[in-house]
Amino acid sequence: MRRLAPLLLLLAAAVPVLPDYAPVRPEAPVVLPRDHGAHPAFRTEWWYVTGWLALPDGGRRGFQVTFFRTRPPVDQRNPSAFAAKQVIFAHAALSDPARGRLRHDQRIARAGFGLADAATRDTALALDDWSLRRRRDGRFVTHVAGDGFALDLVLTPTQAAILQGRSGYSQKGPDPREASHYFSLPHLAVSGTLGEGRQRTPVTGTAWLDREWSSTLLNRRAVGWDWLGLNMDDGGALTLFRVRDGQGQPVWAGGSWRDKAGRLTILKPGDVIFSPGRPWRSPRTGTAWPVSPTVTVTLPGRRLVLGVVPLFPDQELDSRRGGGPLYWEGAVSVPGGRGYLELTGYGAPLKM
């Protein structure tokens, strides 16, 4: 974090211009492997890995490794090497039920100078000594070393990617321009090493990778979203999201269900209901987080009702000191599956 304050001052001092961000277009499908790489013409983008780890002694951990790329509203024609044309930041977190709180850390730097990079040819992200890249054999490898923890993991795809929405065009609001290009890789097989303090432990597990990029993501009424990604025990995969207004009412909703046979159902706004349940209140921020919702999903010929149970309640991640949001990102389980729940906009409206 040693360069964080100077970088934020630089961004604040940058002369804004009317940005010519690339639009999300429904007629532009996601194409793989091309779209594993960065899309610098768009305003924002992320590579989001979440998963569960199993330790040899039977212990469990949840983990998050996320890289973000953002294009600030500065003149991209500026010839200065110091112009913050692209900024890379990253979050990493470890959920330990024995500890009852997250370990987490973050990094941020402008692209260039050998400090940070997001390659366009394929997934190849670097930020200081943190990294996430896709190898020629299709496996992903990541290294992050945070405050009291480290992750060195190999993520092996076992299923085809899910192109969310319509061939990867995922609408996020009533205006079709409120959308992202979005695909997911569920059921990644995890192997590697977990570091906790001075101890190094071999781990295995299952993870989920979300890839998303956009220039206009949220409706002006939206304050945040709820997102749920579940790897089901039978090989199915469930993605759900809800964009909320200030009264907690849905602005938009959607997701996908791919069953164990590989049949994909794209979910419409009326197919997805998040019922909050009893909230957990953070002792640090005072924010009430609905960490145990019940989700109701309407599928062809049946209705799926799942109660979400967090690995433990306190999985709040406060990245505001790095210019990021306050959010809850935690390992959760449902009958017949495990995954991650993300909650944003409960402490303050999310700015995107």
Predicted regions and their residues:
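Basic side chains
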Residues: 2-3, 211
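Bacterial Sec-dependent signal peptides at the C-terminal "C-region" and cleavage site
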Residues: 3-4, 9-23
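Structured soluble/peripheral alpha/beta segments that form catalytic or ligand/cofactor-binding pockets
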Residues: 16-352
